[in-house]
From Swiss-Prot:
GO terms for molecular function: heme binding. Its main location: plastid. It is found in: Plastid, Chloroplast, Plastoglobule. Pfam families: SOUL. InterPro entries: Reg_factor_effector_dom_sf, SOUL_haem-bd. It comes from the Eukaryota. This is Heme-binding-like protein At3g10130, chloroplastic. Residues 1-70 form a transit peptide. GO terms for cellular component: chloroplast; chloroplast thylakoid membrane; plastoglobule. Keywords: Chloroplast, Plastid, Transit peptide. It comes from Arabidopsis thaliana. Belongs to the HEBP family.
C-alpha cells in the first residue's frame, strides 16, 4: 500500500485554497484543459464587459450621411460639366482671326476656335483670294423653300444636321461642332454623293432647291456614323480650287447676289484662273447667331480652274 505523507497533503490543500488567478497556466493541448478553460473564459468575459461599446448610429444620421455623400458626388460631376461648358464657351467668346485679312472689314472679323476644312492660300488680291481646299466630308440636307437664307428654312435645316452631329445616328456618337456652315444651290437633277459604304444618291426635284451642310470632324475620315434621318446625306467633297470673297454682317439673298456678281467680275481680269463652267456659288457662315454683325465672317466662293488646263 502506498503511503501519503502529511507534507504532500498540506501542499495540495494550499494549492486548492489559492485564488484562480494564481493557478499555473496550463496549455490547452495538455491533459487538463477543462479546469483552465473555465477560469480563462470567465476572465475573458469580464474583460469584454469592461470594453467600451460603440454608440449606435440612428436612421436619421445614416440618411444625412447618404445625402451628404450624394451631394458631394453631384458637386464633383457638376464641376466637370461646368469645366467642359466653359471650354466650349471659350471657343466662341474668345474667337480667332484669319491671318489673311486684306482690308479693314476683314480685320474685325473673327471665327470660333473650331475645326474647319483644311486649305492653303495660293495668292490673294485686294478683292479676293485663291485657295486650294483639301478633301473633306460633310453631312448635308435639302433646305425647304426657294431661298437659301430665310429664317425658317435655315433654322429647320440647321436643327436637322445638329441632331445628327449630336447623336441621332446609328451608333449614337456625339461629334464635335465644326465651322463653317455651308449653303449652296442645287445644280443638277441627280447628284451622286460618294461614301465608302454605302454609295448614296440624292435627287432634287428642281434647280431652285438649296442645301445646307456641316463640315465633319476630320478624325472620322470616311468612317462616319450613318444618319438615322433619311434627309441627311453624307458626301465627300473632293480637292478643289476656289476663289473666295469675305464680308461681315448678316447674310441675305440680296447681299449674296451682289457679292457673287462682284466676284465674277473681278475674276474676269485674273490672268491665271477662271470660273469653271456651270458652277454655282457656295456661302460659308462661320459664326453663331449671337455674334455682333461687324465681327461675323461670311464667305462667297466660286470654284475655279487654271486657264492653262
Amino acid at each position: 500500500m502506498m503511503m501519503i505523507s502529511s507534507s504532500s497533503i498540506t501542499s495540495s490543500l494550499s494549492l486548492l485554497s489559492s485564488s484562480p488567478e494564481k493557478l499555473p497556466l496550463i496549455n490547452p493541448i495538455q491533459r487538463c484543459p477543462i479546469t483552465y478553460s473555465g477560469f480563462r473564459t470567465a476572465s475573458v468575459n469580464r474583460a469584454i464587459r469592461r470594453q467600451p461599446q460603440s454608440p449606435a448610429v440612428s436612421a436619421t444620421e445614416s440618411r444625412v450621411s447618404l445625402v451628404l455623400a450624394l451631394a458631394s458626388q453631384a458637386s464633383s460631376v457638376s464641376q466637370r460639366l461646368l469645366a467642359d461648358l466653359a471650354m466650349e464657351t471659350a471657343k466662341y467668346v474668345f474667337p480667332k482671326r484669319f491671318d489673311s485679312s486684306t482690308n479693314l472689314e476683314e480685320a474685325f472679323m473673327s471665327v470660333p476656335d473650331l475645326e474647319t476644312m483644311n486649305f492653303r492660300v495660293l495668292f490673294r488680291t485686294d478683292k479676293y483670294e485663291i485657295r486650294q481646299v483639301e478633301p473633306y466630308f460633310v453631312a448635308e440636307t435639302i433646305m425647304p423653300g426657294e431661298t437659301g437664307f430665310d429664317s425658317y428654312g435655315a433654322s429647320k435645316s440647321f436643327n436637322v444636321l445638329a441632331e445628327y452631329l449630336f447623336g441621332k445616328n446609328t451608333i449614337k456618337e456625339k461629334m464635335e461642332m465644326t465651322t463653317p456652315v455651308v449653303t449652296r444651290k442645287v445644280q443638277s437633277v441627280g447628284e451622286k454623293m460618294e461614301m465608302t459604304t454605302p454609295v448614296i444618291t440624292s435627287k432634287a426635284k428642281d434647280q431652285n432647291q438649296w442645301r445646307m451642310s456641316f463640315v465633319m470632324p476630320s478624325k472620322y475620315g470616311s468612317n462616319l456614323p450613318l444618319p438615322k434621318d433619311p434627309s441627311v446625306k453624307i458626301q465627300q467633297v473632293p480637292r478643289k480650287i476656289v476663289a473666295v470673297v469675305a464680308f461681315s454682317g448678316y447674310v441675305t439673298d440680296e447681299e449674296i447676289e451682289r457679292r457673287e456678281r462682284e466676284l465674277r467680275r473681278a475674276l474676269q481680269n485674273d490672268k491665271k484662273f477662271r470660273v469653271r463652267d456651270g458652277v454655282s456659288f457656295e456661302v460659308a457662315q462661320y459664326n453663331p447667331p449671337f455674334t455682333l454683325p461687324f465681327m461675323r465672317r461670311n464667305e462667297v466662293s466660286l470654284e475655279v480652274e487654271n486657264k492653262e488646263d
